[in-house]
Amino acid sequence: MSNSRQHQGHFARKRFGQNFLVDHGVIDAIVAAIRPERGERMVEIGPGLGALTGPVIARLATPGSPLHAVELDRDLIGRLEQRFGELLELHAGDALTFDFGSIARPGDEPSLRIIGNLPYNISSPLLFHLMSFAPVVIDQHFMLQNEVVERMVAEPGTKAFSRLSVMLQYRYVMDKLIDVPPESFQPPPKVDSAIVRMIPHAPHELPAVDPAVLGEVVTAAFSQRRKMLRNTLGGYRDLVDFDALGFDLARRAEDIGVDEYVRVAQAVASARASG
C-alpha cells in the first residue's frame, strides 16, 4: 500500500485527520455489521471520498429518504454532491458542534443511526459530544483507533480502564467488532484501527444520576490515576460519608466500576441539593 497522501485525486489533510478506507473486504464487513435498511434515518460522520457512503446508500437511501452526512472538508462536499446527488443530504460543518438531534425523526422513540470513520485526532471529544444525543439514537458504528476502542470496552482493574470507559459504559452497551490494519487505508495511519458498536441504554436502564456530576467525580478520580482515591476524591469528604456508602478509598481509579462511581455521584448531588 502506498504511503502517498493522495487518493482519487484528493490530498488527505492532516488537520482533518483524513485517512481514507480503501480495503473493499473491510468495507463489506463494516456494511454487514451495520445492516442498513431502506428508509432508515442514518447519518455518516466524515464520509470522505465515499468508500462507505456508496454501499450504505445502495442499501438504505431513496430520493425521499437520503443518507445524511456531516463533512467539514468543502473540497470533498462538492465531489460527494456530484457523485450521490439527492441520495445524500450533506451538512457542511464540524461534527464536534453539529446538532445530531436535528436529523432524528420527531417523537419520543430513538430513530437515528450514526456511522463513520471518525478522525482519530478528535475521537474522544466527539464521543463525549455524541452522548448528549443518545436519547434519539438507535445505535452507532464507528471506526476508531484500536487503543481508543480497547479503552471504551475495558473492564475495571485493567490498565485500559479510564474516564472514557466509565462515562461511555454508563451510557452505552459497547462491543468491539472488527480489527482493521493500517494497510486498509490510504495513507496508512501509524496505528491499528477497530470497529465498535454502541447501543444506548434504554431510559429505564439508566441510573438516576446527573451526568455532569458523574463526569466531575470520574474526572477527579482519574486526574492522578496512580494515586489512591483518598487523594483524588478526598475533596468530597465534606459531602460524602464514604464509609456509610461502603466505598473503599484505599483503591485506585481504574479499580472502580461504573456502578460505584454512580453511587458516589448520587451522594454528591444529594448533599449539594440538601445543603
UniProtKB/Swiss-Prot annotation:
It comes from Burkholderia pseudomallei (strain K96243). It comes from the Bacteria. Specifically dimethylates two adjacent adenosines (A1518 and A1519) in the loop of a conserved hairpin near the 3'-end of 16S rRNA in the 30S particle. May play a critical role in biogenesis of 30S subunits. This is Ribosomal RNA small subunit methyltransferase A. GO terms for molecular function: 16S rRNA (adenine(1518)-N(6)/adenine(1519)-N(6))-dimethyltransferase activity; RNA binding. It catalyses: adenosine(1518)/adenosine(1519) in 16S rRNA + 4 S-adenosyl-L-methionine = N(6)-dimethyladenosine(1518)/N(6)-dimethyladenosine(1519) in 16S rRNA + 4 S-adenosyl-L-homocysteine + 4 H(+). Keywords: Cytoplasm, Methyltransferase, RNA-binding, rRNA processing, S-adenosyl-L-methionine, Transferase. Its EC number is 2.1.1.182. GO terms for cellular component: cytosol. It holds the Pfam family RrnaAD. SUPFAM superfamilies: S-adenosyl-L-methionine-dependent methyltransferases. S-adenosyl-L-methionine binds at N19, L21, G46, E71, D94, N117.
